[in-house]
Design a protein with these regions (language model features):
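Short glycine- and hydrophobic/aromatic-rich loop-to-beta-strand nucleating segment
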Residues: 119-125, 162-164
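Conserved alpha/beta core of the MobA/IspD/sugar-nucleotide pyrophosphorylase nucleotidyltransferase superfamily
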Residues: 136-184
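Nucleotide and nucleotide-moiety/phosphate-recognizing core
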Residues: 1-118, 126-131, 135-137, 144-157
Length: 184
């Protein structure tokens, strides 16, 4: 089954005070780090959903105030039309996620999975996406209605997977990223 990735780049970034997609993380924009990550784990196509042109294939969020599921639903419809069968959904506020953090999700059997206590990232078979999913839905509801498994989060990965919504959270993640990439 062909895998594509959606990177959610919407949201007002009010708590962060800057567009999270454009923030630099050790010299690279968040959106670029995530696009490379998605390719590394096998995504054949990357689609950003939200606002702004980030130099990648994009889809404007048809309901910018409708929450992440509105963007996921729009992206899933676009990817289904292109013949993709499975989607990895990433949030732009989590650019320090590592390939090994995603491996358990990628390896799941249909219809896909998300981690316990986190709604993103997730992997979902496109045909499992509820046809009525859209604005106002919580991601948790999408996960439940799609029948996605809940997996234990890999040890030490929770903070990376949760991402950064404030400058303080970004500072903690950036410090850890710099230490990890310097040691590598």
């Amino acid at each position: 089954m062909r895998l594509a990735a959606i990177i959610l780049v919407g949201g007002a970034s009010a708590r962060m005070g800057a567009d999270k997609a454009l923030l630099c993380w050790n010299g690279r924009r968040a959106v670029d780090r995530l696009a490379d990550l998605a390719r590394t784990v096998g995504a054949e196509h990357i689609l950003t959903v939200g606002h702004g042109d980030h130099g990648l294939p994009r889809l404007d969020d048809p309901s910018p105030d409708g929450g992440p599921v509105a963007g996921i639903a729009a992206g899933v419809a676009a990817l289904k039309a292109k013949g993709y069968g499975r989607v990895l959904v990433l949030a732009v506020d989590a650019p320090t996620v590592r390939p090994e953090d995603l491996s358990p999700l990628i390896a799941t059997v249909p219809p896909g999975a998300a981690y316990e206590g986190l709604n993103l990232p997730l992997v979902m078979d496109i045909d499992a996406s509820p046809s009525d999913a859209g604005p106002g839905w919580a991601v948790r509801r999408l996960v439940e209605r799609a029948g996605l498994a809940r997996l234990a989060c890999p040890a030490g990965a929770t903070e990376r997977l949760r991402g950064a919504n404030t400058p303080e959270e970004r500072h903690r993640l950036l410090t850890a990223l710099l230490q990890a990439e310097t040691a590598a």
